[in-house]
UniProtKB/Swiss-Prot annotation:
Cross-referenced InterPro entries: PRR22
Ranges annotated as biased composition (Basic and acidic residues): 413-422
Organism: Homo sapiens
Compositionally biased intervals (Basic residues): 383-400
Protein name: Proline-rich protein 22
Length: 422
């Protein structure tokens, strides 16, 4: 492994055995920097990072579990395998070369070629046929990565499923496509469109079940439906059972047209009054609301007329039937009545108004003046109260009532309002 040292050995015989020769030998032993510098390369040869050139060319054997390719590279036979394919396309498709000699049992000792048929090889793309891990370098071998077989023609049918190949053979669709059929290389390209054609008719059969459930849920809840006639559905609810009789596979437009026609016919025929009675308006005009709560500025309607009109509440009413609407609220009878001539009702309404009038509560603490002072500012109070009706409950009616035993609290703010002009 080490280079010979021809320079150190002949030094002693040339000089002979003399003290000078010994000294010369010692001098030569101290001088040989170049000759003694050779052991470090010999020691460095053990280092894997700096192997000497002659050792690179000759390797004793590949590492355990690896095989050496003709290029000198080592590979794992469990991942890669050596195959040799003839460049001539006219000859047989695929060959495999075994080890020349020294192979384990099951591998022939002489180099030979195995003719592998492409169909069995493609149908069984299992692990490489090498049962061993270490093999002596043999004849001409090539390093190829071991991937799934190149021919995706027969294997492409496996992606469709177990019933994919059989269904493809039975369908007459591939013969119709005569353009790509005569070309032998693109059989996998032909196989891809038929699975799409097979799956397309199968897709409509699956969604109807899920769509029927969704359609049934939407039919029970007319709120989220985008149709523009929710009131008609309430009136023609009797015609709903006939809608699910149609198959769920129909388009939504047809179903909408059938529903619309059935609802229009049933609404004109029956037109139940109970539906109108149950249907309450969600929006009320501001004028009607102000008339309902007696807050309309400049309203000169008599108080008794509101209570005299009975009848059901209609959304088109302009205020004549508003008394019935306010009575539909869950409020005490004192607050639902407009007859302020009753002292109890007037007292209750005035107390409710003063809960929200914080100025009046703060200004009630000053001493109350005599009755003559309360009579003078009464008309001024009625005018100002009517001007600010949006913030207070029923102040206009309260100002018209004369000071009585039930209206003991109003004199406080009246005195203040009368004192403001001074």
């Amino acid at each position: 492994m080490q280079h010979p040292k021809p320079f150190c050995a002949p030094a002693a015989p040339q000089e002979g055995f003399s003290p000078q020769s010994l000294e010369g030998a010692e001098v030569l032993g101290n001088q040989p920097a170049p000759t003694c510098a050779e052991p470090p390369p010999a020691m460095g040869s053990l280092n894997l990072y700096h192997p000497p050139d002659p050792e690179k060319e000759v390797f004793p054997a590949p590492p355990a579990g690896f095989q050496m390719a003709p290029c000198g590279c080592f590979f794992d036979p469990r991942i890669y395998r050596i195959e040799w394919t003839t460049p001539d396309l006219g000859q047989s498709a695929l060959y495999k070369l075994a080890a020349s000699s020294g192979g384990p049992a099951g591998v022939p000792s002489a180099p030979g070629s195995y003719l592998l048929e492409p169909q069995p090889y493609l149908k069984a793309p299992g692990l490489p046929p090498y049962p061993h891990y270490q093999q002596a370098p043999g004849g001409p071998q090539f390093l190829l990565p071991y991937f799934p077989p190149e021919g995706p023609g027969p294997e492409a049918l496996g992606f469709v499923g177990d019933a994919g190949p059989a269904a493809f053979v039975e369908l007459p669709l591939p013969p119709l496509e005569e353009g790509p059929a005569p070309l032998p290389p693109p059989p996998p390209k032909e196989n891809k469109p038929p699975p799409v054609l097979i799956t397309l008719p199968a897709e409509p059969t699956l969604p109807p079940d899920a769509y029927s459930h969704l359609q049934g849920h939407l039919g029970h809840f007319p709120g989220p439906e985008p149709l523009a006639f929710p009131v008609k559905e309430l009136q023609g609810s009797g015609a709903r059972p006939g809608v699910p009789l149609y198959p769920p596979g129909l388009s939504e437009l047809k179903v909408a047209e059938v529903k619309e026609g059935a609802l229009l016919g049933a609404g004109k025929a029956k037109a139940p009054k109970t539906a109108r009675a149950l249907a309450l308006p969600d929006k009320v005009l501001l004028e009607d609301a102000m008339k309902l709560f007696d807050c309309l500025p400049g309203a000169s309607e008599p108080e008794g007329t509101l209570c005299e009109v009975p009848g059901p509440a209609l959304p088109d009413s302009s205020g004549g039937n508003s008394a019935d609407d306010i009575r539909s609220l869950c409020l005490p009878e004192e607050l639902l009545s407009f007859d302020y001539s009753v002292p109890e009702i007037l007292d209750t309404v005035s107390n409710v108004d003063y809960f929200f009038n914080f100025k009046a509560l703060d200004e009630e603490q000053p001493p109350h003046p005599g009755p003559p002072a309360t009579n003078t500012p009464a008309p001024i109070l009625s005018g100002k109260r009517k001007a600010s009706t949006a913030k207070k409950g029923k102040p206009g009616r309260k100002a018209r009532q004369p000071a009585g035993p039930a209206s003991a609290t109003p004199p406080g703010p009246r005195e203040d309002l009368g004192a403001t002009p001074h």
